[in-house]
Swiss-Prot record:
InterPro entries: Flag_Lring
Lipidation (N-palmitoyl cysteine): 17
Name of protein: Flagellar L-ring protein
Keyword Signal: yes
Record organism: Sinorhizobium medicae (strain WSM419)
Cell compartments where the protein resides: Cell outer membrane; Bacterial flagellum basal body
Amino acid sequence: MRMRITAILAAGLLAGCQNQAFNEIGRAPAMSPIGSGLQYTQTPQLAMYPKQPRHVTNGYSLWNDQQAALFKDARAINIGDILTVDIRIDDKASFENETDRSRKNSSGFNLGASGESQTSDFAWSGDLEYGSNTKTEGDGKTERSEKLRLLVAAVVTGVLENGNLLISGSQEVRVNHELRILNVAGIVRPRDVDADNVISYDRIAEARISYGGRGRLTEVQQPPWGQQLVDLVSPL
């Protein structure tokens, strides 16, 4: 029995060691290969968008959908084109809720009777009182502040039937032994891309923006996996 418990504990320790951080002991975090985040696969969600006939540009026209102006570079509109995403997030939110509830109830009864007979006199009385008092108070406050200013290049990975573009971009910066990773993805309209091939983040539909990283500082800030497991299953 003791050998079995020891084997289970050893297997758990080995499972905890088989992660990327264990393989990077003594060296800086490895960067992802170029183009690793550009694999585009058809997803069922794309079926939600209606199919529309592709716009055909007249051969005699001087303008087309890709051209922003006569003397400007063409805008990104095809798979493989590159555009710049301008991320300027400066959000602040404050919520404060207060609840106060009170109820008081009181009731009373008084009964009495008396009588006289030839043999004896009798009298009785009774009092009954009851009351209740309940009170509930609640106070909650939430404050949030986020500020992020970044520019990241993204690649057009797909074109929907209605002409909207699927974009995906990532940026990795390694300073000493800490790797910062920025990912952005979403759906944009070609008309929202300006003449400099720049689009603001608030014009990206289904935007997915993540800014994080991994490295020595991140490992220290995160609790060990054993502690996370205990916190997950502990009822207290």
